[in-house]
Design a protein with these regions (language model features):
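Fold-level signature of zinc-dependent metallopeptidase catalytic domains
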Residues: 1-13
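Metzincin-family zinc-dependent endopeptidase catalytic domain
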Residues: 16-133
């Protein structure tokens, strides 16, 4: 059975060229059927947000995505999230995958040069997203 990977943008409109590059990369890397879903433009539940840190709880985001999408064993979900997140014991993360590998998330803010006060570099930003997808 061929693996199916669904790219799910959250609060982010995935540019067509990035979507195409990401689909090609994942298809080649995992010999999978890859498709990009319609973006989720709803905020995750606010109880998944840590107000003190001003960051989202990544492991809780993964559980929310799993419950919302219910992928079967042959389907993998990669969420592209336009918000900052952390995992217990870490100040921040660029991305995280769950233990059984059905759902993962990439968090965009810290992949952008502008986050560090540098000039926008979309080419580097896209490369970072593609690298973090695997």
């Amino acid at each position: 059975m061929k693996i199916v990977i669904i790219i799910h943008p959250i609060l982010f409109e995935l540019p067509a060229d990035l979507s195409s590059s990401l689909e090609q990369h994942l298809s080649k890397e995992f010999d999978a059927l890859v498709k990009t879903a319609v973006p989720i433009n709803d905020m995750p539940p606010l109880n998944l947000f840590d107000k003190n840190r001003k960051q989202w709880k990544s492991s809780e985001i993964l559980l929310w995505l799993l419950g919302r999408n219910k992928p079967d064993r042959g389907t993998k979900l990669i969420a592209i999230c336009d918000f900052d997140a952390y995992s217990n014991g870490l100040n921040f993360i660029f991305g995280q995958a769950d233990a059984d590998g059905r759902v993962s998330a990439i968090y965009l803010p810290r992949l952008r040069q502008e986050f560090y006060g540098l000039k926008t570099d979309n080419s580097l930003f896209y490369k970072r997203i593609i690298r973090d997808s695997t």
